[in-house]
Amino acid sequence: DECLKYGIEPLVTMFHFDLPQALAEKGGWGRRECTDAFVRFAKVLFENFGDRVKYWLTINEQNMLTLVGPLIGTFNTEGVANIQKELYRQNHHMMLAQARAMALCHEMVPGAKIGPAPNISAVYPASCKPEDITAAGLFSAIRNWFYLDMAVHGVYNHQVWHFLEEQDALPEIQPGDMEFLASGHPDFIASNYYSTATAAMDDSTEEADPA
């Protein structure tokens, strides 16, 4: 109300790295129940603020939660056998929560706009060598396009899906998941942009080594 009083248009981020402690203690985004809890939370937000807030961000920098969660303190690796698999399981649940929240926003607050807020970084090949160009394309898919393809089109990026297969990190896809993912359509993409990146092929392994 104070923002509107002074002519400031509020832009609300629904989730910014921190879960309620009760949910975190139950496993957080690693459990599907967290997806349902987020949708209930979204409903409360839209019911109470939808008449005044017209712009919503779903999950802040979801790709950072997945790519560097252990480094930024949003994921505890203790006792986790396959860290990659657990991170991408959490990511799948967040994607479901985001899609359902976007669909709910359009249903409950038709005039509102909602979208994701990934951390996007332009990725350049370290040289003009074909293998470095390939490495840059793969890293960009893992770093950027995976999250954009899912948010906008509701599908898994094929390059990243293949990467997850190789890493034994594929998430569990339950019946109805892909329909949920396809039902959420963003009105915009909010990009948090801090830096560019380069990528080169690791000659020792002949695999893409993001730098």
Language-model segments: what does each one mean?
Residues 4-211:
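Active-site region of glycoside hydrolase catalytic domains
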